[in-house]
Amino acid sequence: MGPGLRPLLPLVLCVGLSALVPSAGASGFRKRGPSVTAKVFFDVRIGDKDVGRIVIGLFGKVVPKTVENFVALATGEKGYGYKGSKFHRVIKDFMIQGGDFTRGDGTGGISIYGETFPDENFKLKHYGIGWVSMANAGPDTNGSQFFITLTKPTWLDGKHVVFGKVLDGMTVVHSIELQATDGHDRPFTDCSIVNSGKIDVKTPFVVEVSDW
């Protein structure tokens, strides 16, 4: 399951956008984006080296069901989840993909609602680098797999549900991106989530969307 190259690998805002208002930014035109209501973390190991933590902000007001699924899989509260799984698909300047904790090759994974669940909405877009979206095998086939963008893949808008953004740890994401891969985009060196969990957000806060 995955975004984009589906023939090669089978699995890859009304309310929210109304809140987008212009604001000034030193690095270009910016708009206020969705509110972060929860955060999760992934502690990542590449080979036998711990490379750091990825912290992802989640937009529970826009896509509450998708966020609930992601948080539960990060904490492992249902008895299964992301801890111990790998980033199994890496395409430089496009995305890194993970979340297949049942098979580890992009053909597995399950949600907390059953094997799959429907697309919640497409109110959020793939605005640029560091946005987090659900991988799928077509409409309404969301499970546990997700990807983190390394570009602005607008061709995925309306096809994959965006639900989060990397808040900290893009250096870790880029370390995964730089791994050598085989002909199926699988890293030769394991890129593993050795620990994962939830970080409480006492007061929701807004992320900015740049240059779109």
Curated annotation (Swiss-Prot):
Molecular function GO terms recorded: cyclosporin A binding; peptidyl-prolyl cis-trans isomerase activity
UniProt keyword Nucleus present: no
Control of this protein's activity: Inhibited by cyclosporin A (CsA).
The protein's Enzyme Commission number: 5.2.1.8
GO biological process, one term: protein folding
InterPro entries linked to this entry: Cyclophilin-like_dom_sf (IPR029000), Cyclophilin-type_PPIase_CS (IPR020892), Cyclophilin-type_PPIase_dom (IPR002130)
Domain PPIase cyclophilin-type positions: 41-198
Enzymatic class: isomerase
GO CC annotations on file: cytoplasm; intracellular membrane-bounded organelle
PROSITE patterns, sorted: CSA_PPIASE_1, CSA_PPIASE_2
Cell compartments where the protein resides: Cytoplasm
Domain of life according to the entry: Eukaryota
Catalytic activity, reaction form: [protein]-peptidylproline (omega=180) = [protein]-peptidylproline (omega=0)
Keywords: Cytoplasm, Isomerase, Rotamase
Keyword presence, Isomerase: yes
Disulfide-bond pairs as recorded: none
CDD domains: cyclophilin_ABH_like (cd01926)
Coiled-coil stretches: none
Endpoints of the signal sequence: none
Function: PPIase that catalyzes the cis-trans isomerization of proline imidic peptide bonds in oligopeptides and may therefore assist protein folding.
Homology family: Belongs to the cyclophilin-type PPIase family.
Protein name: Peptidyl-prolyl cis-trans isomerase C
Species of provenance: Bos taurus
Encoding gene, per UniProt annotation: PPIC
